[in-house]
Amino acid sequence: PKENLKSLDIIRVGTSGALQNDIPVDSFVLSTHGLDLNGMLHSYQIDSIKNTEVEEAFIAHTNWHQNKAKPIIIKNSKTLEKQFESEVTYKGLTATAGGFYGPQGRVLRLALQDSELNHKIDAFNHNGLRVTNLEMETSAIYGLSKLLGHNALSLNAVIANRANGTFSKNPGQVVESLIKYTLNKIAG
């Protein structure tokens, strides 16, 4: 192992679907927290990075099934949040699903374990903290970064809004706009 460890700034720039009707497609979401729904972080010693109060509120609100991995909520880097927030960013908790189909509430021919789970996630609000969007990376990035001593932030180009049933007409453009926004914020 290295003797002198270096703290990195890790910025995820990706796409996601908005879960709230007031977050339009083609907008940007800055993730204040990552919500690990898949249990990946349970492989590590996570007591120092958990947010037990919010996690317990989420579990109670959703009536989380006991056979699923216990949700974990991890905060972003407040330093990076201050650097990247602006009047064009929406902020909130980003749910991180462990897959594309059932884990995100998509129904094919198989019934979901909890057909109301997406609605419960959308309706969660703990002291103003609500789940704004859904994707598959943020909680792992936040959790591993915190455990390894790095700073992390997730920025999301909203290409769909589940609450409104709307989709970006030009998702490539919103992704490009977010990349430029991110680079400009890095450059200062």
Residue ranges and their predicted role:
Residues 1-8, 124, 130-131, 171, ...:
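Non-transmembrane, aqueous-exposed alpha-helical and coiled segments at domain scale
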Residues 53-126:
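Active-site rim beta-loop-alpha module in soluble metabolic enzymes
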Residues 71-76, 131-138:
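Polyanion-binding loop/helix "lid" in catalytic or ligand-binding cores
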Residues 162-188:
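His/Asp/Glu-rich mid-to-C-terminal helical/loop segments that flank catalytic regions of hydrolases
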